[in-house]
Swiss-Prot record:
Family recorded in the similarity comment: Belongs to the gamma-glutamyl phosphate reductase family.
Catalytic activity: L-glutamate 5-semialdehyde + phosphate + NADP(+) = L-glutamyl 5-phosphate + NADPH + H(+)
Function: Catalyzes the NADPH-dependent reduction of L-glutamate 5-phosphate into L-glutamate 5-semialdehyde and phosphate. The product spontaneously undergoes cyclization to form 1-pyrroline-5-carboxylate.
Pathway participation: Amino-acid biosynthesis; L-proline biosynthesis; L-glutamate 5-semialdehyde from L-glutamate: step 2/2
Cited PROSITE patterns: PROA
Cellular location(s): Cytoplasm
Primary localization: cytoplasm
Keywords: Amino-acid biosynthesis, Cytoplasm, NADP, Oxidoreductase, Proline biosynthesis
Protein name: Gamma-glutamyl phosphate reductase
Cellular component GO terms held in the UniProt record: cytoplasm
Cystines in this chain: none
Gene this protein is translated from: proA
Amino acid sequence: MITETLTASSARPGEAAALIAEMGARARTAAKRLAQTPTAEKAAALKAAAGAIRARSAAILAANAEDMAAGQTNGLSGAMLDRLRLDEGRLAAIADAIEAVAALPDPVGREIDRFTRPNGLELSRVRVPLGVIGIIYESRPNVTADAAALGLMAGNAVILRGGSEAVHSNRALHAAFAAGLVEAGLPADAVQLVPTQDRAAVGAMLRAQGLIDIIIPRGGKGLVARVQDEARVPVLAHLDGINHLYIDGAANPAKAVELAVNAKMRRTGICGATETILIDRAYPAPLGIVDALIAAGCEVRGDRDVAALSPHVESASAGDWDTEYLDAIVSIAMVDGLDGALAHIDAHSSRHTDAIVTEDAATAERFLTGVDSAIVMHNASTQFADGGEFGLGAEIGIATGRLHARGPVALEGLTTYKWLVRGSGQLRP
């Protein structure tokens, strides 16, 4: 078969198209099977996949070490290397996340609503799988397992195309996952990994109408922009996380410091990390925020007012307000109250996650209703922007658009619905 012989160096456009067509056809067959697979069988397959990952942990970590060494040689940034790195704890978390997905309520077949028309027709909407999902992603090997688990539990077949940075990690994780599927009696074609790193394969996936039902890109602006520009199949985009934390004049200072440090520094390389902090001019202790971040190892870039607070603050450029650092860097600006914060967020937010720190309930409600982002928070760290923290299990990403899902995309976001109409012989007049 093409998938057994195609290599990264030989994948010319015609060969890549043939490869994706073959994989898509097999995925389509698997998707038909999965759409009818009972919940218990899907859950058993995921548990078997998690077990296989644990059993093969040494091989997976060795593969990841190979990727890490190559990444360091190739000059990957600290943030990219952090996303790429696996250790025993992270690998255990991947297996645990798969089992957590297996324990979630199955959305497939769930009735959304039901009603009867005056003519006696009984209508209902029920959730059904999307079909075949193509995932194109960079750096994060955990996406291999998360996407496979979520896609399968939602009754979908999945075609994975990971980045070259994580090629060995992705292959090792996929091999373990596929072994679990086969052990549980489900088709290995339910989760396939594109075997070539040639960019032509990405283009072929984007043009695979009739074979792939939706593409979900996970990566930087360049990848997402290419997918959105070239795709002929629907796209569910996960864009950058230019997230804001607004510290209101009525914020509790101790709480504000703790939230600012956690939201920025807990893990700087994730999409839920705060990148810009806005401080109300009425807030009494702005220097405390700046000093706490610097003490935590964060570089602070500030507007004129913030730069005047400390000699350790760098002056922010115009581009800083539109930058997703994914690093220990934060931009801080002083604003004129809630209206100033809302105006800044409206101009610079990527519509991912924005938060307010305040003890004023009315101000909090104005912020929650006034910010047009997928996730809006009050007195909570933006690092909670995560499907697992929302109780959704693993996530495929944070959708920042409006169709067809928004926020953490987990099981329900990987389904659609169909109408069921039950009659007794009604004729339309």
